[in-house]
Amino acid sequence: MIDKSIPLVDLHRHLDGNVRVQTIWELGHQHGIALPAQSLAELAPFVQIQGKENSLVAFLKKLDWMVAVLADLDAVKRVAYENVADAALSGLDYAELRFSPYYMAMNHNLPIEGVVEAVIDGVNAGLKDHAVKINLIGIMSRSFGQEKCLLELEGLLAHKDKLVAMDLAGDELGFPGDLFNDHFKRVRDAGLAITAHAGEAAGSESMWQAIQTLGATRIGHGVNAIHDPKLMEYLVKHKIGIESCPTSNLHTSTVDNYDVHPLRTFLDAGVLIGLNTDDPGVSNIDIAHEYRVVKSEMGFSDAQLAQLQRNGVEMAFMSDSDRKALYAAKA
């Protein structure tokens, strides 16, 4: 199912959406934070999807618990370290971990730049102990408005040499991309690549804006592109990568079930699309789960799965020499 000769990657993976249940429990008790359960077993349903619950509101509540326990920078560093460990344990050769420093900082008024530094330190510590390659993507969380995003941007750009890209995430309908044109001009001026969550809650116009104005060369989710033939042609012609997260799309009710997920439409059209986990801690999945469901629920062949795997490597924000090294390590 997973082709061992091709590097296994996960490019759309939120570091702040992957906090272990055990870690939430321990940090909550360590810092006197009231948790919604009296035992570790009882806590799991509050922070992880159980079974087939598909509700955006429920999903976001679970996500919020993951940052509610980040009471100090040591907690941030621990979560970053464990993200590297989890990536390695799930068999990934390469992952891009993205994080929103304001979202991680806001519950306990942590310094935004301090959060960025703690994430970098935790990832570096993790890389010393685990055989996986990691790059970092900074997120501006649009839901908190332009000013908070500017604070995030400044904290992230202070360490731009430790990042490969910047992302725009959050409430796509309430805070359209046009509000962040100036923010992304600074990102482009800093020489960072750009990805953006778009075409998930909003339509294809959100994707056009992200690509043509913000400068995105990859799009997170992008499920609504299939309703715009001109956009589909553009995606193929310009090799705009689509970071697909099927299980997450189900859990957030972006799609009703795997049968109607547009992954196959994208692949058949020749769009550069790959599989990702999104918030693996909340969805309670790993990358192998995504390949399994695409095969079992969506009927993809092993050849199609291998194409998705190759696409992921091609889309990665890395140099051609690093890409070749990833393949060489699989030989």
Swiss-Prot record:
Function: Catalyzes the hydrolytic deamination of adenosine and 2-deoxyadenosine.
Entry protein name: Adenosine deaminase
Active site: 200 (proton donor)
GO molecular function: 2'-deoxyadenosine deaminase activity; adenosine deaminase activity; zinc ion binding
Annotated residues for binding of substrate: 14, 16, 170, 279
CC per GO annotation: cytosol
Free-text cofactor note: Binds 1 zinc ion per subunit.
Gene that encodes the chain: add
